[in-house]
Design a protein with these regions (language model features):
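Short, Lys/Arg-enriched N-terminal segments with co-localized hydrophobic residues
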Residues: 1-8
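C-terminal end-of-chain micro-motif
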Residues: 45, 259-262
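Conserved beta-strand-loop-alpha-helix hinge in the C-terminal portion
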Residues: 228-255, 260
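Feature targets compositionally biased, intrinsically disordered low-complexity regions
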Residues: 1, 16, 24, 70, ...
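ABC family nucleotide-binding domain
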Residues: 10-224
């Protein structure tokens, strides 16, 4: 894994003075402006913003798919400045799980094979790979769909396969970009329940959404507009009934001593 280290950190994400500019013809267009953002280990945060607000650009930088024009970014305690392409790939592979709106499943591979993919890149032996993939699918309630092809799965089931793939390598951070955007409300609710369970188990989750109802499932909401972040306490004063139910669920989970994901 080269310089990618597994060290204890208080924050899994640190962005300090981050700017991102793109060229449009001869003009430099600012997309992110002096972004300062910290996310603690074990936190569940939603970043909200309209189209063109810069939220996807920020997600790409945090996910080590892009680099800032200016500023410092640390992911899982690792400063990404100066990392080689291979080291950036290792950081994504071992420390970050990705969930996308469009699932990004391989159409000619089974659910199990799709989930095994990151483990193949990590050179995990075949038998161990299969065991880990089966366990991840069990966590999302799809142990009875392991041999199904994506075309045989509903939208919600496809997203659950994508979540299993994202967590199979036990990443420090789960990044979710509009994870319910292509789902009906029932499937979206199921995905949010899985995220809550994963967070209870210690997974740090950063979710991007334009939907305040979806954002309210997180413990913290940060809004972005015109490339500028501003903290928002909407999650605290938004859907009170939802938050009360979640607190009760968390208490029940603690009293039961934990358990499998939904």
């Amino acid at each position: 894994m080269g310089r990618i280290k597994d060290i204890f950190m208080a924050n899994v994400i640190e962005c300090r003075g981050v700017y991102k500019n793109y060229m449009s013809g001869k003009m430099e267009v600012p997309v992110l402006r002096n972004v300062n953002f910290l996310m603690a280990e074990g936190e569940y945060t939603a970043i909200m913003g309209p189209s063109g607000s810069g939220k996807s650009t920020l997600m790409n930088i945090i996910g080590c798919l892009d680099v800032p024009t200016e500023g410092k970014v640390l992911i899982a305690g690792q400063d990404i400045a100066g990392l080689s392409d291979n080291e950036m790939s290792d950081l994504r592979l071992y420390k970050i799980g990705f969930v996308f709106q469009t699932f990004q499943l391989l159409s000619r591979q089974s659910a199990l094979s799709n989930v095994e993919l990151p483990l193949s890149y990590a050179h995990v032996p075949r038998k161990k790979r299969r065991e880990m993939a089966m366990e991840a699918l069990k966590k999302v309630g799809l142990e009875d769909r392991v041999n199904f092809m994506p075309s045989q799965l509903s939208g919600g089931q496809k997203q659950r396969v994508a979540i299993a793939r994202a967590i199979v390598n036990n990443p420090k951070i789960l990044l979710a970009d509009e994870p319910t955007g292509a789902l009906d409300s029932a499937s979206g609710k199921q995905v949010m329940e899985i995220f809550r369970q994963l967070n209870r188990e210690g997974v740090s989750i950063l979710m991007i959404t334009h939907d305040r109802e979806i954002a309210s499932h997180a413990d913290r909401i940060v809004e972005i507009r015109d490339g500028v972040l501003r903290e928002d306490n909407g999650a605290e004063k938004g859907d009170g009934e939802l938050r009360e139910k979640r607190a009760a669920d968390d208490r029940d989970y603690d009293e039961a001593g934990g358990g499998d994901a939904v």
